[in-house]
Regions:
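Thiolate-centered catalytic microenvironments shared by cysteine-dependent enzyme domains
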Residues: 100-103
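C-terminal alpha-helical interaction appendages
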Residues: 1-94, 106-109, 118-136
Length: 138
């Protein structure tokens, strides 16, 4: 993984964290982001979105999602949000899979439930374990 890719993982982690600080319900935000054109743009080899900061990216997601993000819902702790955002982006670079497919394999509830156990693991191992959990549910 190169330096730019790791920086983009950090930006996505901070984006998820920022959604919590702005009191956007976490499940609604994560689903809206991971299935958005913004996430799709970040998945591409090169896109101008990759050079935007988390504040700009959040506005893009909010504009596209509309009222979905104003519903009530739980707001996860910022460390949990950062880890989920970081790992989802890392997962994309590690496997080449698109964001929407990653979300299907590691749903939000699975990520939240496994945070305490997985956040200290090597990222690759956490991803492989999450893929295994998904495979067992099939």
């Amino acid at each position: 993984m190169d330096e730019l890719q790791l920086k983009l993982c950090d930006i996505q982690g901070r984006l998820f964290e920022l959604s919590g600080t702005q009191e956007i319900p976490s499940e609604a935000f994560i689903k809206a982001f991971m299935t958005s054109e913004t996430a799709k743009a970040l998945d591409s080899t090169y896109n101008r979105m990759q050079w935007m900061g988390e504040e700009y990216l959040l506005e893009e997601v909010k504009d596209a999602a509309g009222d979905i993000l104003s519903a009530s819902g739980e707001i996860f702790q910022t460390d949990v949000l950062y880890w989920i955002g970081y790992l989802y982006r890392y997962w994309h670079y590690y496997t080449g899979e698109p964001s929407n497919k990653i979300l299907r394999q590691a749903p939000i509830e699975t990520m939240k439930r496994n945070y305490l156990m997985f956040h200290t693991m090597a990222r690759e191992l956490a991803i492989e374990d999450l893929k295994e959990i998904h495979a067992q549910k099939k």
